[in-house]
């Protein structure tokens, strides 16, 4: 008698456009995007962007605040994340207004994903401990994600 158990992990692949960083996945710090393992179903991501964007023929540097979001990932899915725009003015305006800045697709289809700016902590380094900010965010909202 052989009993086979399968873990509820999706063997999804994740592609991040240049400059996009995955800070945490389901509350766990991700040092290398290749190590990111999605669970089948809802996954909580914290992303930010650091790099150069086009601004009236010049290149302007921008480093965004982290955004938190939940993406529904079926098994064996391909998840692609890019910026909504490569225009500095558009991304800067959206960050200032706390509007979405990322474009997310699952298996080639645009995913409807609510993106929020991760609430900062008080003090000199408002995003110095992103995993703790995610824990606080989830606790306040009664959210639980498997890692």
Model-identified regions with their sequence ranges:
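Sec-dependent N-terminal signal peptides
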Residues: 1-2
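N-terminal signal peptide c-region/cleavage motif recognized by signal peptidases
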Residues: 5-8
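Short loop/turn and low-complexity linker motifs enriched in small/turn-promoting residues
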Residues: 11-38, 44-147
């Amino acid at each position: 008698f052989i009993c086979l158990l399968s873990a509820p992990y999706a063997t999804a692949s994740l592609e991040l456009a240049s400059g996009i960083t995955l800070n945490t996945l389901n509350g766990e710090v991700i040092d290398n995007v290749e190590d990111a393992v999605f669970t089948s179903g809802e996954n909580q991501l914290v992303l930010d962007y650091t790099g150069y964007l086009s601004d009236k023929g010049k290149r302007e540097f921008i480093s965004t605040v982290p955004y938190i979001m939940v993406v529904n990932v079926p098994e064996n899915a391909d998840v692609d994340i890019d910026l909504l725009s490569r225009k500095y003015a558009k991304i800067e305006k959206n960050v200032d207004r706390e509007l979405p800045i990322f474009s997310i697709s699952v298996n080639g289809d645009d995913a409807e994903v609510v993106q929020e700016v991760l609430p900062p902590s008080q003090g000199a380094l408002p995003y110095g401990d992103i995993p703790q900010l995610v824990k606080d965010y989830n606790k306040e909202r009664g959210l639980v994600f498997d890692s």
